[in-house]
Every structure is written in structure tokens, then in C-alpha cells.
Amino acid sequence: PVNLISIDELQDDQYVVPVSGMGAPTVSLEKLPSEIELTNPLQELERAFGKKADVIIPIEVGGINSLYPVGAAAKLHLPILDADAIGRAFPEAQMETFHLHGLEPEQVAVGDEKGNVALFKPINAYWSEYMSRALTVQMGGSASVSDYFLAGKDVKGSVVNGTLLLAREIGEILMHQEDYDDVFKALLDRLNGFELYDGKVTAVTRETKQGFNFGTAQIEGLNNYRGKTFSLEFQNETLVAKEGDEILASVPDLIVALDIESAFPITSERLQYGSRVKVVSFPCDPQWRTPIGIETAGPHYFGYDVDYIPVEELQGKEK
């Protein structure tokens, strides 16, 4: 078992280190991490800083990166913080709330399943991304990263709190659907989300390059959305949801394709022809709606010539 601690239990002088995976999710479906891959980067940072980590934190609460740090915490017998540095998942390393608060990585360690470990000193979070990504590509397209070594006092106020318990709560809803008249409504209500459309995936184009999965899913409307065509565009995570050329939701808000039968999420690497989905969107943490948050992870950064508009405004309603 892993001990989960709250932000209130974190001491100012405790050292907090993230553990995360980097790379294209399609690669990690076949190239599984080893035990040493999860722990080597953290231990390399301990040697570099001459200090021991006291607490592990997830960089993001989305996908496999919500579980990698749990595995590392179990192996190293360290507690894990009920918080993360995104409040969702993002594809690039500078897209962390630490960066939004002026905390830049001093040293970064990247490791693979074979035991290779690289340590470098980036000048800022963007260079941390560039260099980590290059190493990840050379390590086969997926690797593990520890990119900060922070005192508890710096972590407080620069993370998204309570996200692991929130993830467990969402899991409980999905695992006990018999308790709800409408599980989709339960999920949307809990996360202040919006239904965008129901549809069937008619085509998926996907390319793995530069350490990412890039692609587009074309979707034909179902149920109340028959006769309409939609699309999802992704770089590991979904960036925009469209009806024709109209944007229905965009980063930094969260866009999720839910299996229309099971209500479980379908990640971008698992979307395929014939998938029947309910596409929904949830507002991001308020830290991402600041000017630096939008600059770091808004639609302009990903090459879209549109300004960020919160999903609740795009959908014309407040929750």
C-alpha cells in the first residue's frame, strides 16, 4: 500500500519529486516500463542534489501518469501527494503549474527500461521539454522522467490539489454505475462538464513523430446529433473538438471521448474506426486560464489561429 498525504500534511522542509512517463502512448502499449525505469530518474536526482526525496507527486493526473508515481512510491516506500502539476494531462513538459508559478527545473533525469539514465541542466522548462523529448526518442519512444526537486514550501500554492482523490471518486462512479440513473450526467455534474456530441468514429489518421502521437478522428453524429460531422484533433491529448470548422472546445479545457456503452474514457491511442463515443468537455483548473496558462497551453501554442474561449462560453451556459 502507498500512503497518500494531503497538501496540509506536507511539511515545508520536505523534498517533493515528480515521477512521470514521457513519449508516444502508442509506443508504451508495447514497450512496457520496467521497475528500474520508474525509480532510476528520481534516484539520479537524489544523487545530483545530495538530498533524499520525502514525497512523490504525479506530474499529471491523466492516463498512465496517474499510476507511474504510485508504482514508484510503492517501490521506494515513499508517500504520494494528493495533488498534481496539471489537473489533467498535457503533452509537453513545460505545461506544468510549476512553470506557471515561476518554478523552473534545475536538473532533469530521464531513464528507460534497460537502465540507461541521462541527467542534464536545462535553462528553463521549454528546454527541459526539448532535451527530455530528444532523449526519449533515442530511448525508443517512451521513457520516465523526474524533472523537479522542490521543497514543500514551494509546492504549496503551485499545484492542483486533491486530484488523486478526485480521480478515485470518478473511478467509483464508473465502477458503480448501477447507483446512478444516468452515469454520464453523474460524471458531468461532478466535474462541471458539458456534453458536446454523440457519434461514431468513421476514420482515424494517426502518426507517431517527435515523441508524440499526432492525429485526427472523424466522427459521424448519432442520436440527437445525426446528420452532423465532427472531429477530434490530438497531440497525445485531445487539443480541439470541432463541428465542421467550428470549435466546440479547446485546450486548456479537457476534452474526453467516453465509450457510449461503458462510459469509460477512450484515450487518443485507442480511438479506432467504429468506436461509438460521447464527447464531453470539462473546464480546466483556473491556473490554466491565466495569461501565462493560456500562453503555455492554449490553442495558439498548438498552432490554431483562434483565441481561447472557455468551454462554458462556447457552449453558451454556466454550470
What are these regions (language model features)?
Residues 10-54:
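Glycine-rich oxoanion-binding loops at beta->alpha junctions
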Residues 14-21, 95-135:
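A structural-propensity feature for long, helix-poor, extended segments
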Residues 38-39, 59-70, 87-92:
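Short glycine/serine/threonine-rich phosphate/pyrophosphate-binding segments
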Residues 113-163:
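Conserved anion/nucleotide-ligand pocket segment
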